[in-house]
């Protein structure tokens, strides 16, 4: 795709939570970005009646860390080489200034839908299929700008708290 369409003209849709580590999916994001592409992320969401309906959904903390790191890679000059990971491949340091990271989390932008075209961070939620990877009561990719309670829930999920269905 990169050779045919050129830089900034292609992307890859990735599903997080199907057995890969955070490091593995973020290294894939970095390769796509380095080739000139865009990363579009979805959380694994086991659909009732599908062959994978018994698989567990993505861990919320994992999903939020991957969303944040992917946003840094795609839109904020982040690089997976500057991030730190633990022995299980979980992100332990995003490789950016703490104040900048806090401001980015507070903006809510990294946690919005990213499966639709957009080369600027302002355009990442051009999605017309909201709730493609979750239900309206357990939002994984927000199809709208986050408000303070949404950001608070995301922070709790990133801290490992089991915040999910019924909270929103």
Sequence positions of predicted segments:
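Eukaryote-skewed repeat-based solenoidal scaffolds used as protein-protein interaction platforms
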Residues: 1-5, 15-16
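Active-site glycine- and acidic-residue-rich loops that bind
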Residues: 15-27
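A cross-domain feature marking catalytic cores of carbohydrate-active enzymes
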Residues: 12-16, 41-43
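Auxiliary Fe-S-binding modules of radical SAM enzymes
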Residues: 4-7, 26-168
């Amino acid at each position: 795709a990169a050779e045919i369409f050129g830089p900034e003209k292609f992307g890859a849709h990735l599903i997080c939570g199907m057995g890969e580590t955070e490091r593995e999916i973020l290294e894939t994001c970095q390769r796509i970005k380095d080739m000139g592409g865009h990363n579009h992320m979805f959380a694994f969401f086991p659909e009732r009646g599908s062959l994978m309906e018994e698989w567990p959904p993505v861990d919320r903390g994992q999903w939020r860390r991957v969303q944040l790191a992917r946003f840094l890679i795609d839109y904020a000059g982040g690089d997976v080489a500057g991030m730190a990971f633990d022995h299980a491949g979980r992100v332990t340091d995003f490789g950016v200034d703490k104040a900048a990271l806090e401001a980015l989390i507070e903006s809510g932008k990294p946690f919005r839908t990213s499966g639709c075209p957009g080369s600027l961070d302002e355009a990442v939620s051009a999605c017309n299929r909201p709730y493609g990877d979750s239900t309206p009561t357990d939002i994984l990719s927000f199809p709208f700008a986050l408000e303070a309670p949404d950001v608070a829930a995301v922070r709790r999920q990133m801290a490992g708290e089991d915040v999910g269905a019924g909270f929103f």
